[in-house]
Amino acid sequence: CWHTNPGGIKEVYPHYVYTGSYIRPVYRDNNPYAGDNNHKIPFAPVVNNTSGSIVGYKYLNMNAVPRDKSLQMQLRLKAEDTDGRIRIMLGSPWTTKGGVEIGLVNVKAGSTCREFYASLSIPAKLHKGKQPLFFVFESETEGQSICEFYDFLMLARP
């Protein structure tokens, strides 16, 4: 997982202060769900996803993604205190550097929904080889987290 902060990371001894996304440490001590492959609880969620934050995953094998089916992405997250959007980008998080937006998810502040879906549109030129995937967080409100981000699935629909 790759993540950036809109204002960088500041050290305030003995801690670090993040202005955007970071991976929250999760400890399994005294956890009744403890188990190596237990998906009932989120492990190491990406938190503090403020406007301008970018979270990326390298690399997805696009050769394994079916071309003859419609695609959706399921995002598991917890909405927080501000409305926002998550742009799903392939190749780069910036269109000026060759990135292509393949989906968009709107997140409503305080929503109790935990699964959000986005229809995906992947251009043929990016539908091959290994491609990096990025989630770009946007909001009209600066400095407030849009959501806690747990995981995602790419789904092929007939």
Stretches with model-predicted labels:
Residues C1-P158:
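Extracytoplasmic
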